Structures are given as C-alpha cells and as structure tokens.
Amino acid sequence: MVWGKICWFSQRAGWTVFAESQISLSCSLCLHSGDQEAQNPNLVSQLCGVFLQNETNETIHMQMSMAVGQQALPLNIIAPKAVLVSLCGVLLNGTVFWLLCCGATNPYMVYILHLVAADVIYLCCSAVGFLQVTLLTYHGVVFFIPDFLAILSPFSFEVCLCLLVAISTERCVCVLFPIWYRCHRPKYTSNVVCTLIWGLPFCINIVKSLFLTYWKHVKACVIFLKLSGLFHAILSLVMCVSSLTLLIRFLCCSQQQKATRVYAVVQISAPMFLLWALPLSVAPLITDFKMFVTTSYLISLFLIINSSANPIIYFFVGSLRKKRLKESLRVILQRALADKPEVGRNKKAAGIDPMEQPHSTQHVENLLPREHRVDVET
C-alpha cells in the first residue's frame, strides 16, 4: 500500500516536511481500504505508524538512502533551497515578533503576533527536516529528528490556518456590522480566541499521535483522520467565504467606506495562503508513491515560501505611498496593522486639500470679518 510507505517515509525517518499532507491523503485511502485493515496486521502496523523497535541504524540508513535515491532530482533541487528560504523566513518573522512583542495595540496586532510565532515554529521544523534530507542527499549523513517535531510541524501549520481564519472572520464582522463591532465587541476577544486556537490543535495532534503510535486502533484512527481532514476543509471554506465577502463589500461600497491598511494585509495574506496551499487538495488524488513524494516536497516548499513572505507583505503595505525614507521598522509595521483610515491621504488622493475644507479652522477664520484700526489724530 502507498500509505504504508508514506507513513514510514514521514514518521520513521522523521521527515516532518510531509506531515501536513498525511491527513489529506489518509482520507482518500480510507475510501478504498474498507475493512481490510482489520484483516491485515501488516497494514495495521503501517497505517498506525507502529514500527519495529529492533531495527538497526544500518538498516534504517539503507532504507532512507533507497527512498532518497528514488527522487534524487527533486531532492537536489528543492531541499537546499527550502533550507535557505526557511532560515530567511525565521529571520524575518523573528524581526516582526520582536517589533510587535511590546506594541500590540489592536486586535489585529494580537493575531499577527501569534501568527508570526506559529510561522517561526513551522519554519524551524521545516528547516530541520529539509536539512536532514540535504545532508543525506549530498553527504550521506543521517541524523534522527526527535519525535516531538513530528507533532510540532503539523501543529504549527494548523495554528497558522486557524489564525488566518480568525483574522479574516473578525475583519468580515467589522465590515458587515461596524456599530456592533465598535460598541459591543468584548475587549479580550483576541486573546481568548488565540488561546483557544493554540489549545485546540495541540489537543488534536496529541490525540492523533496516540492513535497513530500507541493505541493501534485502526478503525478509530481512520475515523479520526477523516474528521481531521473535514476540519481542514471547513477552515479553508470559511477563509474563502470571508475573503470573498470582504472583496465584494469593498467593491460595492468603496465610496462610502474607507479602506484601512490592515484590510489590505488581510486581503493579501489570506488568498496567498490559499493559493500556496492549493496543491494540498491534489495530494489525495495521487496513488503513485514517487509522484506523491515529489508533490509533498513541492507542497512543503510552497508553504515555506508563504510563511516567509508574510513579513514582506506587512512591510510593503506599511511603506506604501510613503515618501519618507528614514522610518523605523516599528513605525512601518504599526502603520500596516493600523485599523484607522488615513483621512489626509485619502483626501489628497481625491484631489482635495484638507486645509481647504469648509469645516477646517483656517477656512472659518478666513470668513470672519477682520478688525481695522484707524488712528484718528486729534
């Protein structure tokens, strides 16, 4: 079975770069497997990720070398670049985290702060996984990754997905119900939502790890993986609906409502994530092992690029239409995540000078009569 090879490929070798696509592939496998899992003990051990403990390092080294040799070209091209992009992404996201750590003044900054932290975790796990592949491909060196990284990688990916859904949904509520959002929104909603987002995927991945590694219950394993795949599909659908609603609202009411920079950040980040993660929907349709390995590498590389590009989006939106060259990164970042329209810039873009408005102080003073003193000589 293809799944048995993939389970070994990602779990036993410690290649966390395939973790995000295992759930999607398992859903398609369950449609074909039926009740054969209970009749085939070998398939049971492969499906649940239960591996023999008495394998020697030489055997594992030989198996990994054979698996890598089947996809030498994608490894030579993708793995080193993925390591480099991951390290650059860690540096960029780390800078954003440091700038926002003490300056989260609105709900969107709180969400972005947690999103950056999840991106850093995911990029670190991906860098370690691809570094293992690179060393094995070019130098034949094998080192084993701790087991907790196999949980940490999909956990951080799911946190990123949930945070993007929360950001899109909150922005959608803010645009559709502005009065309720400004007056009745609970103050600590962002902190509570972020806490739940970190806790829910953590519990899901812990239970998934128990199903796959210790309990050896195939039926429960299959049901759980189906539910996990459904959970991912629902989150992606909610993000699509929120982004589309924001876009339609902006196109229909662009004259009445002034767009903020954080709106631009949301409208760029959410579709970019969906675009880079789009190949995930293709993975369940692949039955060839070699093709699945190549697709898994590409999916991982795309997700790494997306996580690394988020800070570039923040700084680009924050510095857009600003002619000041000497501005700190903190000011640019705070401007990008500000939830207030820039009145002066919008009026200037419309050809209106704010100082010439009828309600401005200068205009009122010009309308007042001036006093004239006349010195009368006696």
UniProtKB/Swiss-Prot annotation:
One of its GO terms (molecular function) is G protein-coupled receptor activity. One of its GO terms (cellular component) is membrane. PROSITE patterns: G_PROTEIN_RECEP_F1_1, G_PROTEIN_RECEP_F1_2. Glycans are attached at N54, N57. Keywords: Cell membrane, G-protein coupled receptor, Glycoprotein, Membrane, Receptor, Transducer, Transmembrane, Transmembrane helix. Residues 368-378 have a biased composition (Basic and acidic residues). SUPFAM superfamilies: Family A G protein-coupled receptor-like. It is a multi-pass membrane protein. It is found in: Cell membrane. PANTHER family: MAS-RELATED G-PROTEIN COUPLED RECEPTOR, MAS-RELATED G-PROTEIN COUPLED RECEPTOR MRG-RELATED. This is Mas-related G-protein coupled receptor MRG. The lineage of its organism: Eukaryota, Metazoa, Chordata, Craniata, Vertebrata.
